[in-house]
A protein has these predicted regions:
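Aromatic-glycine hotspot motif
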Residues: 1-59, 67-179
């Protein structure tokens, strides 16, 4: 997705491991989704106890990641850069999933839209100056943070959803065991 030289150009005062993870995530997300058997992409387990992400089916995980990238992090980045210490909203994901009928989404389109959004995210990050990384905001549920913090939280969100897809894969496999 992005080569090492591009990541280094993005680097400035950002951790290159974080930047590499952000750049690699679209391919990882697609691979994790592809590993879910097609018959289980809309499947829900009998219990969501222990899920490391929101309680979403595999297709719903994709839609959520796309929407949080665009309507969550793009907006948060813009506001943190343009406003003085803004309060950044947390998005209530479950009503959004129901309203947008995530379960009926076309995975290929969702993944393509997400890839484009992540390119835009990496462009935003690559354009940041050293003076912009410490800009501050308050994020609902997280408290005070910096622009740099937001970038780390986005990377954490990515990893949370890879873990959610792995958790679903484990539950799918466990569902084949007789009770």
């Amino acid at each position: 997705f992005y080569g090492a030289s591009t990541i280094m150009r993005f680097g400035k005062n950002m951790n290159p491991t974080t930047l590499s993870a952000l750049a690699a995530f679209p391919s990882q997300l697609e691979a994790h989704y592809a590993a879910i058997p097609p018959a289980f992409r809309h499947w829900t387990p009998p219990s969501w106890e222990g899920v490391p992400s929101e309680a979403f089916t595999a297709i719903e995980q994709l839609c959520h990641v796309r929407d949080i990238e665009i309507e969550g992090y793009h907006v948060r980045f813009r506001r943190t850069l343009q406003e003085s210490h803004p309060t950044l909203a947390s998005i209530d994901s479950e009503p959004l999933a129901a309203e947008r009928n995530y379960g009926a989404a076309d995975a290929a389109k969702v993944l393509a839209d997400f890839r484009l959004a992540r390119v835009q995210t990496m462009e935003i990050i690559s354009s940041l100056s050293d003076a912009q990384l410490p800009r501050t905001a308050v994020f609902e549920g997280y408290g005070p943070l910096t622009m740099r913090s937001l970038i780390h939280y986005l990377c954490s969100h990515d990893q949370q959803h890879l873990a959610g897809l792995q958790w679903l894969a484990g539950k799918i496999d466990a569902s084949t065991v007789a009770q």
